[in-house]
């Protein structure tokens, strides 16, 4: 098995060198204990050169090293020993073996024969082509090494991991996205939304991260409620004062083409660092932001509406980005076509081939579900998902078991496997009632019996009522009394989803959807299908344009903004969506 794995590594690294990718790959050391079993003269004479002897001779050209451990040096061919540039020589009392060691050393050790025989535990001589003379070294016992570092044998695994992390200059960062602060209107949900944000920052600080990344949609609006901004700023400043930078990009919600976003204001105040900095030219160049402590290089693109995202990606100067060395993070706020969940097939996306290749980490946002994807030629492509949830569909997924949180990433010259850190500010309870075939009165009583069997104390309850009533109106099912009953049972928050409820007596627009943007899109699409529209763009993108226009028109007047300024901003936003230059005066 070891031979198969080593051969595959060697083959891939040969290929990386041929394609110019080798310098961005980590150096690999392959360790063989009892080395004569695979590198012995008899083995090679009987089987011919194997992958280990090949790596001994050629591996360094492809950033692969071989570490052979043995006391019986004489069993290994001189041709193999000669290609091992550094030898750590421990005590050996066998004269024949000492002779082979001395004969294959990079320096003249003929006067050290007896010294090698008398080397004690922890004593060694290093002979290497990289030094002018052999170097005596002292190797501490593992127990002494741990004690000198201030650790004891009973210390936890976390203590040991932290010790090695510091010793190996391993760094950490937290990757968050889609916090959507200010999305929730219900006071308790708004508090939980913020609590999730605070808990994530606290957890990341406790994990001693070196920096944080928020991959878009920190706020639910580009001009959020001022109380939301105040609380968020206090938390972000607390992180910054702890010596932890926060790197962000715009999401599709907190970007505005016509006015200053709250992201810009927070950057001006020194609370966060916006990392998307285009370089003008025929191709779209991107400037890297270098983290001062770790040397990590961060760049990327912000979220945009509709097809604008793909246009920006197509203009990218990928060749220049790929040529940059170091540990690179590409920050983005877009769905990737190859990784879209099946039920999100309608979501606009960007093809992976438009991304620069070879970055060590791809920090994604916009998709509200967590995911970590590995694709050849790319570092980990990671979506943390929404931190709490901005829509009813998100909260329903929470209640059905979807975990929310952020990713903790450790790295040296490459990223280790990202660790998902769950953040749970509240417990959820999911209740689903299918009332198909019931009249409205029977359906109401069935719902009452169903909820009575659930423990909802202190929980956020997501009640989904679906099915087609045989008679009666859907409004006959009294949501207010159902909510009161659940609250009397101790529920903290009650959300009732009736989108899937219909009746045979009345059928208007048929939709079965709980995610508000997708619900709006489906309604617009159904209405468009009934219109005689000759404009090709409206036929193909009409639903997307309508949803985006609706979202822009929902923006409230900002503090200090007078009526004419507000109207001008709304008109310019609408023009941006429609692809028109309205000039802010409606003309």
From Swiss-Prot:
Its EC number is 3.1.-.-. GO terms for molecular function: 3'-5' exonuclease activity; DNA end binding; endonuclease activity; manganese ion binding; Y-form DNA binding. GO terms for biological process: double-strand break repair. The keyword Membrane does not apply. The active site is at 253 (proton donor). Keywords: DNA damage, DNA repair, Endonuclease, Exonuclease, Hydrolase, Manganese, Metal-binding, Nuclease. InterPro entries: Calcineurin-like_PHP_ApaH (IPR004843), DNA_Repair-Maintenance_Comp (IPR050535), Metallo-depent_PP-like (IPR029052), Mre11_archaea-type (IPR032885), Mre11_N (IPR041796), P-loop_NTPase (IPR027417). Its cofactor is Mn(2+). Mn(2+) 1 binds at residues 178, 180, 217, 368. Nuclease activity is regulated by Rad50. Mn(2+) 2 binds at residues 217, 333, 366. Binds 2 manganese ions per subunit. Homodimer. Forms a heterotetramer composed of two Mre11 subunits and two Rad50 subunits. Part of the Rad50/Mre11 complex, which is involved in the early steps of DNA double-strand break (DSB) repair. The complex may facilitate opening of the processed DNA ends to aid in the recruitment of HerA and NurA. Mre11 binds to DSB ends and has both double-stranded 3'-5' exonuclease activity and single-stranded endonuclease activity. Belongs to the MRE11/RAD32 family. This is DNA double-strand break repair protein Mre11. It comes from Methanothermobacter thermautotrophicus (strain ATCC 29096 / DSM 1053 / JCM 10044 / NBRC 100330 / Delta H) (Methanobacterium thermoautotrophicum).
């Amino acid at each position: 098995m070891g031979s198969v794995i080593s051969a595959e590594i060697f083959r891939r690294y040969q290929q990386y060198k041929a394609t110019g990718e080798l310098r961005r790959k980590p150096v690999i050391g392959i360790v063989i204990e009892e080395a004569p079993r695979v590198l012995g003269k008899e083995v090679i004479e009987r089987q011919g050169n194997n992958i280990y002897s090949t790596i001994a001779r050629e591996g360094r050209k492809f950033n692969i090293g071989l570490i052979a451990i043995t006391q019986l040096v004489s069993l290994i061919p001189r041709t193999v020993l000669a290609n091992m540039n550094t030898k750590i020589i421990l005590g050996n009392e066998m004269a024949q073996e000492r002779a082979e060691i001395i004969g294959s050393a990079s320096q003249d050790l003929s006067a050290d024969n007896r010294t090698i025989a008398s080397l004690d535990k922890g004593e060694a001589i290093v002979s290497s082509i990289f030094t002018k003379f052999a170097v005596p070294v002292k190797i501490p016992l593992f127990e002494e090494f741990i004690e000198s570092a201030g650790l004891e044998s009973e210390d936890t695994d976390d203590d040991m991991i932290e010790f090695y992390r510091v010793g190996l200059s391993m760094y950490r960062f937290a990757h968050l996205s889609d916090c959507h602060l200010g999305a929730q209107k219900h006071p308790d949900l708004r508090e939980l939304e913020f609590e999730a944000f605070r808990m994530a920052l606290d957890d990341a600080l406790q994990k001693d991260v070196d920096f944080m990344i928020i991959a878009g949609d920190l706020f639910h609006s580009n001009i959020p409620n001022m109380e939301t901004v105040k609380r968020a700023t206090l938390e972000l400043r607390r992180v910054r004062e702890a010596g932890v930078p926060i790197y962000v990009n715009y999401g599709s919600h907190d970007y505005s083409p016509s006015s200053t976003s709250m992201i810009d204001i927070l950057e001006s105040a020194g609370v966060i660092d916006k990392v998307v900095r285009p370089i003008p030219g025929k191709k779209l160049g991107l400037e890297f932001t270098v983290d001062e402590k770790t040397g990590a290089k961060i760049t990327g693109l912000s979220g945009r509406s509709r097809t604008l995202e793909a246009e920006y990606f197509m203009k990218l100067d990928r060749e220049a980005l790929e040529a940059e060395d170091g540990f690179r993070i590409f920050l983005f706020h877009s769905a990737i076509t190859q990784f879209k969940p099946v039920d999100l097939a309608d979501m606009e996306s960007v093809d992976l081939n438009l991304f620069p290749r070879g970055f060590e980490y791809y920090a994604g946002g916009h998709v509200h579900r967590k995911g970590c994807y590995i694709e050849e030629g790319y570092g980990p492509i990671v979506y943390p998902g929404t931190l709490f949830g901005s829509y009813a569909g998100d909260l329903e997924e929470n209640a059905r078991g979807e975990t929310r949180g952020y990713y903790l990433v450790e790295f040296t010259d490459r990223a280790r496997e990202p660790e998902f850190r769950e953040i749970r500010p509240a417990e959820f309870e999911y209740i689903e009632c299918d009332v198909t075939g019931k009249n409205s009165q029977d359906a109401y009583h069935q719902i009452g019996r169903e909820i009575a069997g659930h423990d909802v104390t202190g929980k956020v309850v997501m009640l989904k009522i679906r099915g087609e009533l045989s008679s009666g109106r859907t409004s006959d099912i009294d949501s207010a009394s159902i909510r009161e009953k659940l609250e009397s049972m101790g529920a903290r928050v009650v959300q009732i989803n009736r989108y899937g409820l219909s009746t045979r007596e009345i059928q208007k627009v048929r939709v079965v959807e709980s995610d508000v943007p997708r619900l709006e899109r489906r309604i617009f699409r159904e209405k468009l299908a009934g219109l005689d529209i000759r404009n090709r763009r409206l036929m193909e993108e009409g639903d997307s344009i309508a949803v985006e226009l609706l979202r822009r028109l929902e923006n409230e007047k900002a503090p200090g903004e007078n009526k004419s300024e507000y109207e001008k901003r709304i008109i310019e936003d609408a023009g941006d969506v429609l692809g028109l230059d309205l000039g802010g005066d409606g003309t």
